[in-house]
């Protein structure tokens, strides 16, 4: 008996050549709608679906393959005598290949002007049903949903006259991944349309971007996946202009640097090591901002990741070229800057849009046996809700330094303390188990620069010991959430030393 293939695709990439290859192998081809028309226009002889079902395509194509003659031909177990007898009795013929990809639901809902009706109309019903049937019966049916697999199938047919069992299994597994991702997109779209924030089940789908050489350490395997919709202001959708492939740690660090630099509207440069900022500077232009970020910590910046929120010009590129860096990420690079930086063959250069995340963005964190989902911490300082409990208010320059430190501290691993002065960070204390420990690290790093600087704390002071350390170092202004039962103790210490202190009412823990 002649083998038969059913071909019905929304993505027409390579389908004409593939069907031609099937026909050359003596395989009959059944097709539908637009696919049939395309194949016939290219001189290929195919059988219309209605000839197999004995029933016309109806309801604007909504019902065409949902028929026993199709699904019987797909699901029949060929070495089961009862199945074979029933097929013969009912005049059914087996279908050995299914070549189907689904209505472009993802592409439809990505359109800015998409209507709900358009989205619903692009939910495929017959396609998923067919490919699931074929995949369930993959011992006898080869099912292809991805044009990248056309050449593999044709090569095996030419070499062996059939598709290998292992290949059929791989293709079947891809089908169920494909339909799972497709259904996840639909369920997530409808959930969002209904405004449900915490559904009883959560299905997420990501697309493989690349295999990584290894993970956080060489003994760990790792892969990089991207969200199905382009998040243009992200490392996942950044364009790499130059350099080696990104590593697992590179991606984490670049993501951290990008998150921080998005906080600033004025020209800003951020240097990151191990997902914590080691230097942040702002200026009237990107060269001045980089100079300050470098001077913030000229030791730690070595081997770091740089993010800028303005184009990298030649003058800045020449300064960047002087030290070893892993990555530079920016909205763009001037032609002259690229010429300078591309002389370092391993330096990775990425371009990306710099857009601040919205509160609608979700952050996913895996834990053993579960997944935590929360809104991104996108809250900015609201000067209308702050309070100043101390006798002295910050000066104009202190306010500038406090705002810079506050923007940075929420991106530092808790317990977090950041010192800022004259448009740059001068000390960062990260990840200590007590707040005063982080303060001591930041103060030590700042050295004499701590005199007259501003301090930001990601959470309140449980006791005034951090304030005592700040006063000893000559820090003159502090910004913190407030809310401790010992706030009055901290206020008294601040007043004793003439420190201006701001309460934001907002905590910025980062774990």
UniProtKB/Swiss-Prot annotation:
Show where the MGS-like domain sits: 1-145
Question: Where on the tree of life does the source sit, at the highest rank?
Answer: Bacteria
According to its UniProt entry, the protein's GO biological process terms are: 'de novo' IMP biosynthetic process
An example GO CC term for this entry is: cytosol
The pathway this protein participates in, as annotated, is: Purine metabolism; IMP biosynthesis via de novo pathway; 5-formamido-1-(5-phospho-D-ribosyl)imidazole-4-carboxamide from 5-amino-1-(5-phospho-D-ribosyl)imidazole-4-carboxamide (10-formyl THF route): step 1/1; Purine metabolism; IMP biosynthesis via de novo pathway; IMP from 5-formamido-1-(5-phospho-D-ribosyl)imidazole-4-carboxamide: step 1/1
Reactions catalysed, as given in the entry:
(6R)-10-formyltetrahydrofolate + 5-amino-1-(5-phospho-beta-D-ribosyl)imidazole-4-carboxamide = 5-formamido-1-(5-phospho-D-ribosyl)imidazole-4-carboxamide + (6S)-5,6,7,8-tetrahydrofolate; IMP + H2O = 5-formamido-1-(5-phospho-D-ribosyl)imidazole-4-carboxamide
Q: Which SUPFAM superfamilies match?
A: Cytidine deaminase-like, Methylglyoxal synthase-like
A single Gene Ontology MF term assigned here is: IMP cyclohydrolase activity
Q: What is its EC number?
A: 2.1.2.3, 3.5.4.10
Q: Which UniProt keywords apply?
A: Hydrolase, Multifunctional enzyme, Purine biosynthesis, Transferase
Does the keyword Transferase feature in the UniProt annotation?
yes
The question of whether Isomerase is a record keyword is answered with no
InterPro entries linked to this entry: AICAR_Tfase_dup_dom_sf, Cytidine_deaminase-like, MGS-like_dom, MGS-like_dom_sf, PurH-like
Q: Which NCBIfam families match?
A: PRK00881.1 (NF002049), purH (TIGR00355)
- Give the UniProt family note: Belongs to the PurH family.
Q: What is this protein called?
A: Bifunctional purine biosynthesis protein PurH
The gene for this chain is purH
């Amino acid at each position: 008996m002649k083998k038969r293939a059913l071909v019905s695709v929304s993505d027409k990439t390579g389908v004409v050549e593939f069907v031609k290859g099937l026909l050359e192998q003596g395989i009959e081809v059944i097709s539908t709608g637009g696919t049939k028309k395309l194949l016939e226009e290219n001189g290929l002889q195919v059988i219309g679906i209605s000839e197999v079902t004995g029933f016309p395509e109806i309801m604007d194509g909504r019902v065409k393959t949902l028929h026993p003659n199709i699904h019987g031909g797909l699901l029949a177990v060929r070495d089961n005598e009862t199945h074979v007898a029933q097929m013969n009795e009912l005049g059914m013929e087996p279908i050995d290949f299914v070549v189907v990809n689904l209505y472009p639901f993802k592409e439809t809902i990505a359109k800015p002007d998409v209507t709900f009706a358009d989205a619903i109309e692009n939910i495929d019903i017959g396609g998923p049903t067919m490919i699931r049937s074929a995949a369930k019966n993959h011992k006898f049916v080869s099912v292809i949903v991805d044009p990248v697999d056309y050449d593999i199938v044709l090569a095996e047919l030419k070499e062996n006259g059939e598709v290998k069992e292992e290949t059929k299994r791989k293709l079947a597994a891809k089908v169920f991944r494909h339909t799972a991702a497709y259904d996840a997109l639909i369920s997530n779209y409808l959930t969002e349309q209904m405004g449900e924030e915490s559904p009883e089940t959560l299905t997420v789908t990501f697309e493989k971007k690349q295999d990584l050489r290894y993970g956080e350490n060489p003994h760990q395997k790792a892969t990089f996946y991207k969200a199905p919709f382009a998040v243009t202001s992200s490392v996942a959708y950044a364009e790499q202009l130059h350099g080696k492939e990104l590593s697992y740690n590179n991606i984490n660090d670049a993501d951290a640097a990008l998150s921080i630099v998005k906080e600033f509207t004025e020209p800003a440069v951020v240097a990151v090591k191990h997902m914590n900022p080691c230097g942040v500077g702002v200026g009237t232009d990107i060269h001045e901002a980089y100079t300050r970020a470098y001077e913030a910590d000229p030791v730690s910046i070595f081997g770091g990741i740089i993010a800028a929120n303005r184009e990298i010009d030649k003058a800045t590129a020449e300064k960047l070229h002087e030290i070893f860096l892993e990555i530079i990420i920016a909205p763009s690079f001037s032609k002259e800057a690229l010429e300078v930086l591309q002389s370092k063959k391993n330096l990775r250069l990425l371009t990306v849009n710099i857009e601040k995340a919205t509160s609608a963005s979700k952050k996913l964190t895996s834990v053993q046996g579960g997944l935590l989902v929360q809104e991104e911490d996108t809250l900015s300082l609201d000067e209308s809700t702050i309070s100043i409990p101390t006798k002295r208010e910050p000066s104009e320059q202190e306010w500038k330094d406090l705002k810079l430190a506050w923007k940075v501290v929420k991106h530092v691993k808790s317990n977090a303390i950041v010192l800022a002065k004259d448009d740059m960070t001068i000390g960062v204390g990260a990840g200590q188990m007590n707040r005063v420990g982080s303060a001591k690290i930041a103060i030590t790093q700042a050295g004499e620069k701590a005199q007259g600087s501003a301090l930001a704390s990601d959470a309140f002071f449980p006791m005034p010991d951090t304030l005592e350390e700040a006063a000893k170092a000559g820090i003159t202004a502090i910004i913190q959430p407030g809310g401790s039962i010992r706030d009055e103790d901290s206020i008294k210490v601040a007043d004793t030393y003439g420190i201006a202190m701001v309460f934001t009412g907002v905590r910025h823990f980062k774990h």
